[in-house]
Amino acid sequence: MKRIIITIWYSLFFSFFAVPLFADKPNIIFILTDDLGYGDVGVLFQNQRKGVQIKTPELDQMAVSGTILNRHYCPAPICAPSRASLITGLHQGHSNVRNMQFDKAIEDNWNFANTLKKAGYFTIHLGKYGLQGWGHSPDKWAGYPTKRGFDYFYGSVRHVDGHQHYPANFWEIGDNKSHQGKKEVWENNREVSSGLDKCYTTDLWTAKAKQLIIDRTKNNPKTPFFMYLAYDTPHAALQLPTTPYPDGKGIKGGLEWLGAPGKMINTAKGTIDSYRDPIYTNKGLTEVAERFATSITRIDHCVGDILQTLKDLKIDKKTVVIFSSDNGPHREAYIKGERWNPSVFESAGKFKGSKGSSYEGGLRVPTFAWGPSIIKAGQKTNSTSQFHDWMATFCDYAGLGIPARIDGVSLLPTLSGIGKQRKSTIYFEFNNQQGLYLDGYKGIRMKATSHEVDFEIFNTVNDGPESKNLAGSSEMFSRLQKRMKDEVLRIRMPNRHAKKTYDDELVPGIDIDKNKLKNGVGTNLYKGTWEWVPEFSQLSANNSLLRKDLSITNIPIKKNNGVLFSGYLLVPHSGAWTFHCKSTGQFIFKIHKKLVLDADYKYSGEEISRTLNLSKGIHPYRMYYKDSSPKPSISLQWESEKVAKNVIPANALFVEKPQS
């Protein structure tokens, strides 16, 4: 069977069929919009609201022909941390990019590009990036896309370069010099903005995407590709295209890549920032409202153009398209004397909040998946999922083991409607805001100035607007309040560049009857060859043993095999505990859901250490180990103020007794 293109208009991804069905690996395209609100899309809200509506017929058709993920969440209500979590598969409790850390280099570790590259994919990033690090050129940017697994990059690198959508043109009405001036566009190691006169970036990224899809389908039909297409609209500046959308769509119409300086695309003509979609003129809207609506309908045309291209190339039935947004709707215009308010079109739908807020309006993003014969059509799911689930999903499509370090789960069962969906960990963190889902309820605290601050608790299935705070309303919700406070400490690791008031809190143990435990270490062995330490718990064990300690002495392990140690640690006293580990192979060590030690990507055998504050009691752990040596060895040690550095003793290691 020929490969499948998974075009991700960042929303939901492919289907349960992927791994067993594909003789060749599917192509993957992920398309992410910038600041598009849940309520900005017709099928989700606009078509039902009163007054002038934003029209998105192509997106509407895409959504109803596929699966709508009605409760899909970004990890933070602003772009940089959201995009970092998307790329790395880590939520905001583990990501190295948090809060307002624009332009911070994304960590050098496994991500959705370099994992797929290991599976033979040609990897492409188009559009907005913003995770490159400091400097002025690719040789200085530590986190440049081609240094993070992308074979080809064409787009804007720095955060501010995505705020003006005519990179080669001065924009006189911008409200400051940054929003007026020209911007850089990079193609791999070459800055190319001088040839982009009158190129509106929404059109530019789309034309390049079409060109690459057509060229690779024609010239490299046996090599799968992954395309991450990240638009920089409808984020401000609220600029207009030059012309109406070109007639037609697909390979015989729509946007076209011409490739000539000054005439790079077929809409690079006329006057910049001039075309208002006539469906919004003479309707009593303000100039800024016309601009905002036009920018969204332009994206809609682009989606339809790309989908038609897939159909024209006869790869639509071998393609999955995902659509989504990085966070909720914005409040900026970047125009002299003008302001924008997302309430004009109710861009958050009926939800409370917008960009920058961890209420639903800032975090619940429009997301859906489309793929004839692949994605379950006409499905609307209310199961919760989040950005970090996409990397796991992509690995599943490519037939790869899911890296143990990441926080996500594969969404294939949801997208196909077949099989049991693993529960996603939903966690939010941004400045002093923090939240999670637990037992189906959303807990959110907007000003977590200390860990004692209570969560507001909402049932977002029945109360999307978050109008009824359930916290303290019954004994059940009082218990849930405590559990939420405990759980957020078990999910995340502190980041020294994004400090929180709760960083130094003791991580609580779990409530479990010690009489139901016995000394030992659960030890599962796995056969296989993996580029990284995989999530062994989702694989079938070749053998299961009960060991006394965390060692591989006398374990019948062969080169390139794996081991999962699991059980419970009995921590003898509360305080700071440092864990040290050194190995001939690669390993991942987790306590609760906390990623404590990560010695997988580029690990070279040195001892690594991490300190965390643990309360006295019982804490679940998992140690994932992948052997890469003919003489394997691993040593996990701990120490505290009262306990000298030593191997964790057997009397501190427990497993559950078999049920009689």
Predicted regions and their residues:
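Bacterial N-terminal signal peptides
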Residues: I8-A18
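Loop/turn elements at helix/coil->beta-strand transitions in domains of secreted/extracellular proteins
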Residues: D24-I29, S65-N70, K117-I124, R148-D151, ...
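Active-site segment of extracytoplasmic enzymes that catalyze sulfate/phosphate-ester chemistry
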Residues: F30-I31, G37-H125, W134-S137, R148, ...
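Sec/Tat signal peptide C-region and signal peptidase I cleavage site
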Residues: V19-A23
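Acidic/polar loop patches that form or flank catalytic/metal-binding clefts of enzymes
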Residues: L69-R71, K376-N382, G399-V409, K420-I426, ...
